[in-house]
């Protein structure tokens, strides 16, 4: 990270921009780095120290890293080095929400199991978000009407109105 900091500092001075007096918090720094290192993210497998990375890459955090023992679920690496294994060097903990916001234009969204949700009185579905084949969000409940209004309407008619699952005070 020091080398990246040095390069950025030199560019800021060269551009004539003024430096902030306040140090940036951890989240801001790593969100900024994430935008340029999306191919170097990984999610830890449930068993062992292996991380599943983007584009089907598997790696481990290098033995010299302080993160090696921490076993965070999501990490980003400044460098992936391949020897007999692929090692993540200069790694840091990240949150999956950061990935989604940094890669909004690159993530793929898959919607499944649209259904009538009586408790919220809306047609809901589940969303799976992936980036380069890596699942960022597995099963998030969403309002399906914004995704597919036509199918949402059909589900509403079949599962809410015909099945008399829709509760309203309106007179029909």
Named regions from a protein language model:
Residues 1-172:
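Extended, charged helical/alpha-beta scaffold domains that provide interaction surfaces
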